[in-house]
């Protein structure tokens, strides 16, 4: 499992999780009717900066990551935690 602060949130008609890591980065993992992949039961991931805002300037991605299965979510969370 990923160590770091995690908060479950209700978002639109679905749910999400906000992660915060010791390196100052975090992640938003969501599944709702407007997220990329929700129609297939998949997640959308965003990298967050230390203020909790979307961060588009990491080696991981310059956008959100859609259509992520659970393995992709876990891999991406590990990568964010290791930045």
Task: Give the ranges of each region predicted by the language model.
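Catalytic phosphate/metal-binding cores of nucleic-acid and nucleotide-processing enzymes, i.e., regions
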Residues: 1-83
């Amino acid at each position: 499992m990923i160590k770091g602060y995690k908060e479950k949130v209700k978002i639109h008609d679905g749910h999400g999780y906000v992660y915060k890591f010791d390196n100052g980065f975090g992640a938003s993992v969501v599944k709702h009717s407007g997220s990329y992949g929700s129609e297939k039961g998949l997640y959308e991931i965003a990298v967050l900066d230390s203020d909790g805002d979307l961060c588009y300037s990491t080696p991981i991605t310059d956008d959100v990551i859609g259509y992520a299965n659970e393995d992709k979510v876990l891999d991406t969370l590990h990568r964010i935690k290791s930045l």
